[in-house]
Amino acid sequence: MNNNNFVAVIDSEQMKDEMARLPGEYASVIEELAKARVVRARAEQEVKMIRFVVEKHERDLFKNGIVDKKPTEDAIKMEVALHPKVKAAQEALLDAEEKCYLLEAKKEAYNCKRDMLVSLSALQRAELDTLRFSGAR
C-alpha cells in the first residue's frame, strides 16, 4: 500500500461507544490516583517516623550505658540508613511512588484519548458538512 493513499475510516458507532465509556473510566483512574497519593503520603510519614525511632534508639544506646563510646553523627546516619525497618519502609514508599507515576501516566493517556476523540469527531463533522455543501449545488 502506498502511504500517500492511506485513508482513515472513522467508525461512528465505535467512536460514540468510546465517548460514552471514557468519562467513567477516567473517573476510576482519578479515584485510584487519589487513593494512591494518600498511600504515598502515609508511606512518607512512615519512613520519617521509623527513621526517627531508629535514630533515637541509636542515641539512647550511649545515654543508657549500653555502648561505651558516643557514636558520631555519621555512624548514627549509617545505622539508620542500614536498618531493616528503614529499608522496608523506603521500599514501600518507592512502591507507592511507582503506583502514583503509573496512574498519572494512565490519566494522561485518557486525556490524550479524549482529545483524539474530540478531534476525530470534529473531523467527521467537517467531512459531513463538506459533503452536504458540495451535494447541495
List each model region and its residues.
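Charge-rich amphipathic alpha-helical interaction elements
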Residues: 1-137
